[in-house]
Amino acid sequence: MKYREAKAEDCSQIYALVQETIKTVYPKYYPAEVVEFFSALHSPDNIAQDIGNRTVAAFYEKDVLIGTGTCRENHITRVFVLPAYQGQGYGSQMMQYLEERVLGRYEKVCLDASLPACQFYEKRGYVTVRHETWKCENDVVLVYGIMEKDLTAKA
């Protein structure tokens, strides 16, 4: 797998990857209102803004964009792997790269964990430190975990 910093011209492809993953995976875990919330949260404008801030990584396997992740300071976000490539170790490789961007600058890395990803993050040494809520349409409430990993223990 190869990776590089995402560029402005990658925005539409990254957006398509994120949306495909949300629409394929999230309905198995969340009601439609929450799926739509996630879809809107990861809008082209939000992705473009992060690309402009040079915080987005693009991950490729044989010239195919298979994943993306964003790292702002010590906060990892918008980590998505195309459904066809999930369960093959790509997510772990992506997280290793993103965590290395934080290592040496911060003692901890944090992220907001969706239900589909909680176990994955726990296996990587993340612990849930609290839960947050977000009110979606039709009074549906999204509950998600705030997770942290101590990078000092990784020596």
What are these regions (language model features)?
Residues Y85, G89-Y97, Y126:
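Conserved acetyl-CoA pyrophosphate-binding loop and the N-cap/start of the following alpha-helix
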Residues N53-G67:
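Conserved beta-hairpin
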Residues Q19-D45:
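Conserved GNAT-fold acetyl-CoA-binding loop/helix
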Residues E107, L111-Q119, W134-A155:
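C-terminal "cap" of GNAT-fold acetyltransferases
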